């Protein structure tokens, strides 16, 4: 069961965990050379409400018939309780030879997958009194941050919180949902989008682009345990390194919220 507090249009919401339910593919597009954005409609007449930051599990069988599952953060932006006609979105990384990759490669529009959820507590909390959020992610680990944008906007508008998103990527084409983050930054002065490239910084990059790994940029932001709360999502090595660095800057463990993405075939 997921539980999170929301203010204004975001209410105290309890999202029940259902048994397996069908999701029907209604659309897809490539976000990066190896990442696909998939849009689904729940196909049993029920709504799939969730709290930004939560994930679903996809259940399927391996080639040998044994059951398995994969977890995917929900990417959909919403500021209302979901209805039966609302769709949900996920971002799927394709791994050569992966069982889940084979499942999604073969999935055509109109076909179903079996899912459960939503699960997870990697969510924003309106009881926070911080002055700034540091959102740190790599790869598809920025998916929950996309879902959080409406709630972050409300927090920026109502209590003036500042938000910095550090997004680690090899190249610009690997920056999934970059159009959403660039547009959100342009519309909201309190939101700063800092793409961090492990390879060369593109010639047309914004002034906030950086060269190197996300954890190497933390010193520039001068994290402060008195007013910062950090979220870490993505590669386990990045999460661990950033966690240790943030503790050294004085953030308490309570103010560092983590979710690791482990690639599974």
Regions found by a protein language model. Give the residues of each.
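Histidine-anchored nucleotide/phosphate-binding helix
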Residues: 144-156
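Reductase modules of NAD(P)H-dependent flavoproteins
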Residues: 2-3, 8-10, 16-22, 163-265
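Ferredoxin-reductase
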Residues: 3-109, 198
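A short, basic/flexible loop-to-alpha-helix module at the beginning of a structural domain
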Residues: 118-128
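Ser/Thr-glycine-rich phosphate-binding loops at phosphate-binding pockets of nucleotides
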Residues: 138-143
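Short helix-loop-beta connector
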Residues: 126-131, 224-227
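Conserved beta-strand elements of the Class I
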Residues: 132-136, 231
């Amino acid at each position: 069961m997921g539980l999170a507090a929301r203010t204004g249009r975001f209410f105290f919401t309890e999202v029940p965990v259902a048994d397996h339910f069908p999701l029907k593919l209604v659309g897809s597009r490539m976000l990066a050379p190896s990442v696909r954005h998939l849009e689904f409609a729940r196909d049993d007449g029920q709504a799939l409400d969730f709290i930004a930051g939560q994930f679903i599990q996809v259940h399927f069988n391996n080639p040998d018939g044994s059951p398995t599952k994969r977890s995917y953060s929900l990417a959909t932006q919403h500021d209302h309780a979901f209805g039966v006609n609302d769709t949900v979105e996920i971002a799927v990384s394709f791994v050569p030879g992966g069982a889940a990759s084979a499942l999604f490669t073969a999935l055509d529009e109109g076909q179903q997958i079996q899912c459960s959820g939503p699960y997870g507590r990697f969510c924003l909390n309106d009881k926070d009194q911080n002055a700034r959020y540091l959102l740190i992610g790599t790869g598809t680990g920025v998916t929950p941050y996309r879902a959080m944008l409406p709630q972050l906007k409300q927090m920026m508008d109502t209590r003036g919180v500042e938000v910095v998103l550090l997004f680690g990527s090899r190249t610009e084409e690997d920056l999934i949902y970059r159009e959403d983050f660039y547009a959100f930054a342009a519309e909201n002065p309190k939101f700063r989008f800092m793409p961090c490239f492990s390879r060369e910084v593109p010639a047309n990059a914004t002034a906030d682009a950086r060269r190197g790994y996300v954890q190497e940029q933390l010193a520039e932001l001068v994290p402060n345990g008195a007013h910062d709360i950090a979220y870490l999502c993505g590669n386990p090595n990045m999460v661990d390194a950033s966690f240790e660095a943030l503790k050294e800057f004085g953030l308490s463990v309570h103010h560092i919220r983590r979710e690791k993405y482990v690639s599974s075939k």
